Amino acid sequence: MNVQKPEGKDTTLTTTDGIAARLGGSPGLIVQEVGWDEDCDSTLSEAIEDAIGSELLDEDSYEICDIVLLWWRSDDGDLVDGLVDAVRPLADTGRVWLLTPGNGRSNALAPGDIAESAQLAGMVQTKAERFGDWQGSCLVRRGNKQ
C-alpha cells in the first residue's frame, strides 16, 4: 500500500519499520532465518535486520534466538518436522514466524494444514499477517501466548 508524502514522494507502508513492527522485531533481539531461497521476499529479512541492528542468524546456527523466520513451501517436506526443528534454538518466550506462499500461489499451504502442524509440534498460532505474496503465521509454544 502506498501513500503520498507531502513532498509528493511515494513511500511504502510495508517497508522496514512497518514490517519489523508487525513481526515483532526490535533492537537487541536475536533472529534466525531458516528456509530462505530466491523466491523469498528479502524486504522482510532486511526490515528485521534494520530493526534489530544486526544480521540474521543462518539456519546452521545453534545460538538461542527470540524469533525464527521460517520460510516454508508445500514441497519443502513435513511441516511438523520443520516446526519442531525451528523451536529448538528458540528462547522460552520466543516465537516462530512461519512464512508461506500466499493463497493461490504455487506451493501455498492451507490454513488448516498450518494449524494442524502447529498443534502436532506443540505450538499455537497467535496471529496471521499478509506480507506481499507471503502469508505469515506467528506461532508460539503451547501455553506461551504472546
Where do the language-model regions lie?
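S-adenosyl-L-methionine-dependent methyltransferase catalytic core, i.e., the SAM/SAH-binding region
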Residues: 2-146
